[in-house]
């Protein structure tokens, strides 16, 4: 977290938290979608 604040000194914690949540939700959605495709493909 401190490393991110050093790279982006202008970004406050709310923006960083929102970005991390959106990024993790996207990764979760992609992995879930690929899992469903694999199950349906079998």
From Swiss-Prot:
One of its GO terms (molecular function) is electron transfer activity. It is a single-pass membrane protein. The keyword 4Fe-4S does not apply. Belongs to the PetM family. The gene is petM. This is Cytochrome b6-f complex subunit 7. Keywords: Chloroplast, Electron transport, Membrane, Photosynthesis, Plastid, Thylakoid, Transmembrane, Transmembrane helix, Transport. The lineage of its organism: Eukaryota, Sar, Stramenopiles, Ochrophyta, Bacillariophyta. HAMAP family: Cytb6_f_PetM (MF_00396). It is found in: Plastid, Chloroplast thylakoid membrane. The 4 large subunits of the cytochrome b6-f complex are cytochrome b6, subunit IV (17 kDa polypeptide, PetD), cytochrome f and the Rieske protein, while the 4 small subunits are PetG, PetL, PetM and PetN. The complex functions as a dimer. Component of the cytochrome b6-f complex, which mediates electron transfer between photosystem II (PSII) and photosystem I (PSI), cyclic electron flow around PSI, and state transitions. GO terms for cellular component: chloroplast thylakoid membrane; cytochrome b6f complex. GO terms for biological process: photosynthesis. Pfam families: PetM. The chain crosses the membrane at residues 19-37.
């Amino acid at each position: 977290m401190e490393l991110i604040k050093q790279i982006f000194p202008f970004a406050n914690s709310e923006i960083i938290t929102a970005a991390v949540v959106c990024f993790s939700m996207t990764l979760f959605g992609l992995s879930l979608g690929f899992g469903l495709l694999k199950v349906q493909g079998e």
